[in-house]
């Protein structure tokens, strides 16, 4: 096997991967979801079944911090709009990215409140509470590190319910604190709940381009418990009324999309019920209902939960709740993508540029793999040295394929040559390549991250296709510098067009990935020359390329 045949192996790996991805998209399986169904029920579920109310109409108040711009409905205290000022909707745009939305075209809300037997949000107790607020606009002032937004409601019996949103500077985690003052003569039984609801179908203005040439990031629901660290739950599964029903201490529920997430994190000192629901009209929900709390007459009870609404910043999410950082979608190669990202982030802390960080990590990866690369070229050189013997054997045995195979294997054994030795490094490199792809598509830090010159977003394709062309040029040079034993005319034609085919493949790949491949090819050229010099000394390589 020689370097040019390696290109065929890479091409086959690419084609196989894309066929697999297309099949996955049609079948759309999620291994985590299959595990989930073992712990769920398929009984028809709804928010009402959980004692969770529907939305209502109230007055809208606004809350602005340095990182959040929210709109809260005083009817129930739901967050109906969420803008993220630090993240533009598009590269170069002054319009902030909108995560939560309540419009005729699309619904995505974070609901919360107090349900249970005596909770004001229990549908059996009438309409949702209409909270009173002291003003309609709250702003985190300069020099202020915390902003509280209290909302109060008094029921017909005179009991007072206070719901307070607590915001902190630079934080996407919002604490929601409840105070229940029982002025009656009987205990009040209440339960906190948190629910995320969203339209299943995306309108055009919500399409974030979460798929990129065969690789698709996950959009749907997820949850975590101490027993199940991270489980995805597809919107289609919820829409089909295959509903989640899990009880657990601790954990969280979330809705995910590329780069951003919302999540409710209840307190972990009581049992919480996690559920999903098909709300109808193309809207699905995931939520939690906490264990009931009794507030005795004349007493005041306190409860709390936390809402995450923002980008999937892994270290910050991990500090909010265990395993919340797993919401970053690195696909089935997460076990490679996660350490790769940690290394990349560490390098970035020194160089300050994600593009240069990718270049450095490429050198590190190729340096670690150098022994395998050297073994690959040595194996290919030995295979070339055996070609005259193999050709003579084929001429001697004619059409006896069985004898040919037997004697060829005996020859390999005698000469201590592994015919698959040239493939092994490629098999190792391919998962790293794909893991880097998932990392670029799933890490918020690389969204709109510039490199240099015309590359302003490493997670997007090169707008001028310069990098893919350069990648094709490097492949052409590798091909021309590599000895070949290919004699079949058809294979020779395929080899000739391989750099062109790969250039077309890479036109739609993220710039960061193409940059990685260019640098990797340049390293290959350097390593190839160093290895060939060593092989020449051993008589396994000639500096003059053999002609086919």
From Swiss-Prot:
Instruction: Give the UniProt subcellular location, in the record's own words.
Output: Cell inner membrane
Q: Which GO terms describe its cellular component?
A: plasma membrane
| Annotated Low complexity bias | 29-42
The superkingdom of the source organism is Bacteria
Assembly, per entry = Interacts with the Sec translocase complex via SecD. Specifically interacts with transmembrane segments of nascent integral membrane proteins during membrane integration.
Q: Which NCBIfam families match?
A: PRK01318.1-1, PRK01318.1-3, yidC_nterm, yidC_oxa1_cterm
By what name is this protein known? Membrane protein insertase YidC
- Organism of derivation: Salmonella dublin (strain CT_02021853)
């Amino acid at each position: 096997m020689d370097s040019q045949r390696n290109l065929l192996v890479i091409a086959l790996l690419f084609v196989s991967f894309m066929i697999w991805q297309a099949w996955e998209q049609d079948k759309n399986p999620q291994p985590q979801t299959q595990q989930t169904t073992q712990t769920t029920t398929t009984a028809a579920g709804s928010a009402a079944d959980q004692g969770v109310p529907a939305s209502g109409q109230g007055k809208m108040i606004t809350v602005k911090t340095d990182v959040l711009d929210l709109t809260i409905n005083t009817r129930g205290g739901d967050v109906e709009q969420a803008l993220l000022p630090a993240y533009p909707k598009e590269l170069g745009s002054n319009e902030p990215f909108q995560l939560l939305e309540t419009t005729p075209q699309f619904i995505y809300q974070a609901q919360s409140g107090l349900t249970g037997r005596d909770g004001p949000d229990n549908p059996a107790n009438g309409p949702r509470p209409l909270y009173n607020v002291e003003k309609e606009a709250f702003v985190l002032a300069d020099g202020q590190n915390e902003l509280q937004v209290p909302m109060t409601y008094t029921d017909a019996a005179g009991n007072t319910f206070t719901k307070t949103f607590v915001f902190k500077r630079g934080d996407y985690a919002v604490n929601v604190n409840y105070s229940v003052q029982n002025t009656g003569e009987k205990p009040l039984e209440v339960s906190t709940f948190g629910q995320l609801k969203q339209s299943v179908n995306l309108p055009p203005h919500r399409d974030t381009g979460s798929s990129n040439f065969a690789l698709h990031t996950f959009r749907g629901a997820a949850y975590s418990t101490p027993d199940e660290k991270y489980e995805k739950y597809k919107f289609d599964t919820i829409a089909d009324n295959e509903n989640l029903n899990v009880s657990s201490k601790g954990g969280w529920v979330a809705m995910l999309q590329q780069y951003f997430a919302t999540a409710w994190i209840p307190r972990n000192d009581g049992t919480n019920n996690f559920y999903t629901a098909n709300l109808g009209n193309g809207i699905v929900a995931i939520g939690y209902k906490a264990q009931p709390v009794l507030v005795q007459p004349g007493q005041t009870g306190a409860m709390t939960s936390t809402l995450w609404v923002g980008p999937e910043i892994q270290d910050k999410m991990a500090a909010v709740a265990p395993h919340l950082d797993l919401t970053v979608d690195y696909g089935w190669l997460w076990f490679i993508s996660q350490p790769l990202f940690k290394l990349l982030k560490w390098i970035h802390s020194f160089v300050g540029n994600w593009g240069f960080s990718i270049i450095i990590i490429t050198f590190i990866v190729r340096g670690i793999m150098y022994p395998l690369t050297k073994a690959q070229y040595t194996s290919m050189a030995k295979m070339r040295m055996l070609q005259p013997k193999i050709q003579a054997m084929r001429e001697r045995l004619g059409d006896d394929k069985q004898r040919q195979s037997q004697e060829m294997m005996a020859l390999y054994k005698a000469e201590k040559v592994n015919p698959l030795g040239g493939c092994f490094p490629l098999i190792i490199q391919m998962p790293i390549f794909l893991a880097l792809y998932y990392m670029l598509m799933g890490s918020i830090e690389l969204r709109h991250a510039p490199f240099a010159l015309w590359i302003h977003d490493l997670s997007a394709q090169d707008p001028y296709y310069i990098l893919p062309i350069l990648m094709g040029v490097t492949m052409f040079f590798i091909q021309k510098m590599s000895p070949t034993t290919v004699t079949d005319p058809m294979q020779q034609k395929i080899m000739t067009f391989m750099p062109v085919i790969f250039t077309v493949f890479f036109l739609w790949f993220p710039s960061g990935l193409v940059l990685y491949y260019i640098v990797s090819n340049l390293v290959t050229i350097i390593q190839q020359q160093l290895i060939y010099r060593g092989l020449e000394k051993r008589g396994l390589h000639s500096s003059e390329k053999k002609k086919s």
